[in-house]
Amino acid sequence: MELAMDFALRLRDAANHHLSRYEPLVLLAAPLLALLAARTLHAAAAAVADRGLRTVLLALAMTAIKLLPGVSAYINAEKRKVVDQLQSGGTSTKSTLRTELPTVGLSNQVINDLETLKARDVNWQGKCSGTVYIAGSESEGHFALINKAYSMFSHTNPLHQDVFKSVAQLEAEVVAMTAALLGIKEKSSGGQICGNMTSGGTESILLAVKTSRDYMRTKKGITKPEMIIAESAHSAYDKAAQYFNIKVRRVPVNKEFLADVKGFKRCINGNTIMMVGSAPGFPHGLIDPIEELGELASRYDICLHVDLCLGGFVLPFARKLGYPIPPFDFCVKGVTSISTDVHKYGLAPKGTSIVLYKNHEIRKHQFVAVTEWTGGLYVSPTIAGSRPGGLIAGAWAAMTSLGLNGYMENTGHIMEVSKKIQRGIEDIPGLFVIGKPDMTVVAFGSDSVDIFEVNDIMSSKGWHLNALQRPNSLHICVTLQHTVIYEEFLKDLKDSVDTVKANPGPISGGRAPIYGAAGKMPDRGMVRELLVEFMDASC
């Protein structure tokens, strides 16, 4: 003991003697600077691990370049030119906006004004990828039915359950009918599927992510949450990550353009709260390997969300019709939540989606309860407080009016036309279909022509397709609107490819140069700034 004390004293004296050569301020600053350096190195290492060394070095280089005199002003001027070009198609209407209330109310004249504004919209019938999923004109048939249902309940709000009990029942029935489509009757699902209606796929996704975060914090104590998504997963997951402070680990798709299960596994760590699989993914219409992702989720005890926003009202019926649909719903072990849109192939009014959970224990983490508000006790199930009961009624009317037979018939039509479009594209020299489409989204690219120039020609013919990247490609999301016009689509597409082959190069007012440049631009921060500038100027 005495030897140890003696050694400690001698060590202290030696240290004091050595440090006596330095100023007290230096001794005080040294550990702080060391701590700062350590934190900087840790942050740099984390950035490299997340984004890759090349991306980090490029970002640093671009930041340094922008500090040079005149460079930042030049970049801003060029961004302004790009934004102006993007808006040249008439996207912005700020110059003609009404900015004040009329001095004297317009009374019924407003209907005429609305009709005038509506007449300026493009001719969307049959020419849009996705967008409008119901067949026919908006003034007849199924359109007229759901519009009437909406108008009957346009004054209602499910926030006031004690007043509008009818709407509460309608929502419960819509959720229950959807749960029945997605596995609640199967023993493997556990039979406790529950959920709520939301304003759209993005809100359903936001709620599923928020719920998974809070559930895993309670269950496993995770305070620095991470989620794993494929690079083909919908951008709403990035929005959720920004809103809820969740780190995204983005995994490249495999050679079949599907979620790479091995890549997902490599990303799992002690902070992982959830993984995401799409059925199908928005870009290419391909169903991720949900069963394999479910096995991973079960093994590591984390959440698995399945994005069925596109497929929820197609895949159950396509499977019944005999199409080779891989497992995708709550029957898959490990699936904890699902989002599905009624306003797409469910043929409900815009603004209707559903988020479902495997059981009530998980869903409880979706709710917000406030006990200390002077306005009273408050609890809300979704992001919105007040919600339009008319949309709930419209969704209920859509589902019950169509019934199983109606959805089966519709699915048969759009699946058949989707396959015809796929074969037609494959027959056009210079084009290829991406992956093996499972459903009603067909993505295609080209090795011989600029596909974005093809898109510009198609746009001049009235078509509105979705432009994709990695690889550069287009897709069409087939709806009932296309079942009577798909042959015209294929003819116009072939003619557009032939036109670009004969006259390569951008057309006046086309967006091919912008899309092409954006895809090749190594500084993704610059692309993000362009998008933000465009949105700020457009709304």
Swiss-Prot record:
Which GO terms fall under biological process for this protein?
Answer: carboxylic acid metabolic process; sphingolipid catabolic process
EC numbers for this chain: 4.1.2.27
Gene responsible for this protein: SPL
Phylogenetic placement of the source organism = Eukaryota, Viridiplantae, Streptophyta, Embryophyta, Tracheophyta
GO terms of molecular function: pyridoxal phosphate binding; sphinganine-1-phosphate aldolase activity
Q: Which residues lie on this side of the membrane: Lumenal?
A: 47-54
Indicate where this protein is primarily found. Answer: endoplasmic reticulum
Cofactor(s) in the UniProt record: pyridoxal 5'-phosphate
Xref: PANTHER family: PTHR42735, SPHINGOSINE-1-PHOSPHATE LYASE 1
| Membrane-crossing residue ranges in chain numbering | 55-75
Q: What protein family is recorded? A: Belongs to the group II decarboxylase family. Sphingosine-1-phosphate lyase subfamily.
Keyword vocabulary terms for this entry = Apoptosis, Endoplasmic reticulum, Lipid metabolism, Lyase, Membrane, Pyridoxal phosphate, Signal, Signal-anchor, Sphingolipid metabolism, Transmembrane, Transmembrane helix
The name under which this protein is listed is: Sphingosine-1-phosphate lyase
In the UniProt record, the signal sequence range is 1-46
N6-(pyridoxal phosphate)lysine PTM positions read 344
Lineage top rank: taxon:
Eukaryota
Subcellular location as annotated? Endoplasmic reticulum membrane
Its recorded reaction(s) are: sphinganine 1-phosphate = hexadecanal + phosphoethanolamine
User: What's one Pfam family here?
Assistant: Pyridoxal_deC
